[in-house]
Amino acid sequence: MELLNATLAKIYGLDKEAMVKAQAHQDILIKPQGSLGKLEAIVVQLAGIQGDAKPKTAKKAIITMAGDHGIIDEKFHNWPKEVTVQMLQNFAHGGAAINVLSRQVGARNVVVALGVATPMAADPNIINRNIAPGTNNMVHGPAMTREQAVKAIEVGIEIVNAEVKKGLDLVGTGDMGIGNTSPSAAICSIITGRSLEDVTGRGTGASDEQMKLKRNAIAKAISLNNPDAKDAIDVLSKVGGYEIGGLAGVILGAAANRVAVVVDGFISGAAALIAYTICPQVKDFMFAAHQSVEPGHRILLEHMGLDAILKMDMRLGEGTGAALAMNIIEAANRIQHEMASFADAGVSEKQS
């Protein structure tokens, strides 16, 4: 807990003075005040995070964390667990959707194995921080120990701290793990208080019969483990996943370093919910990249008071939505840096 506690102690609110200056600059640009809508709000929030009315967005990374899940033993999933490590290898060598979208926005990919079940060969492009070969089947007991849950969070903090040392203005979260919509639905239901019917989606394409099995399995896991909704680490340890804990650590670590976090879809959202329950202040550092088609994603975003930048009917994960949203965030910041003011352009201002 030492690293986690030290990280939490470094998190404080937005720089209001920088935000006022950023908004004042927006108000003198050659446009009606407020006419760029959410683009203006984005850059003002960025200013508050970085403490600079002209924030930076050049140095970007997407951290994609992977873990397997014991609940796939319940036989309602369409894909074998081996796919997790196979996709990790694709991430590491540039062939996946997240690689394409990261290249497009100029973000580096950071690929982390945190709880992968299938043995894998050493790869210089994969950071192997495996805590265990996947979670235990939460239908029969806790997914992991409390100590392992804390370790997952602290690995996430360590990973983002290392990226900050390389230079980091924006960090996106991404995930990979067969079966990880189940723990995400469990986390969402427990913390928001919404029913499993409300928050559970089809994941990678579950049939109606698979959906019944999925909801029943998650309900059994929650009933058996009885997690404390107010104790995020208890929730994570009993019904979570290693990659979810790691991404929660990325979010907390980024906030401690005054780095904006672009949160991807449902699994990243579950990680954000864990981080938010530990430290509500982290909301100030998060941008919700998009609203996934997973129904629980909208619910957890509403719980945290976050508005999604995009709505693209996506449900892939990996950090793909985060990479896309970085384009919007960078565009907002370019307006702040490059657009002319009324005085610069010789344009008459609105008459009072």
UniProtKB/Swiss-Prot annotation:
Positions of the catalytic residues? 318 (proton acceptor)
Known Pfam families for this protein?
DBI_PRT
Q: In which pathway does it act?
A: Nucleoside biosynthesis; alpha-ribazole biosynthesis; alpha-ribazole from 5,6-dimethylbenzimidazole: step 1/2
The record's GO molecular-function terms, alphabetically, read: nicotinate-nucleotide-dimethylbenzimidazole phosphoribosyltransferase activity
EC numbers listed for it are 2.4.2.21
Record bears the keyword Lipid biosynthesis = no
Reactions listed under catalytic activity: 5,6-dimethylbenzimidazole + nicotinate beta-D-ribonucleotide = alpha-ribazole 5'-phosphate + nicotinate + H(+)
Task: Show the SUPFAM superfamilies listed in the entry.
Answer: Nicotinate mononucleotide:5,6-dimethylbenzimidazole phosphoribosyltransferase (CobT)
Could you name the domain of life of the organism this protein comes from? Bacteria
The record's listing under HAMAP family reads: CobT
Protein's job:
Catalyzes the synthesis of alpha-ribazole-5'-phosphate from nicotinate mononucleotide (NAMN) and 5,6-dimethylbenzimidazole (DMB).
Query: Which family does the similarity line name?
Result: Belongs to the CobT family.
Name of this protein:
Nicotinate-nucleotide--dimethylbenzimidazole phosphoribosyltransferase
Q: Which gene encodes it?
A: cobT
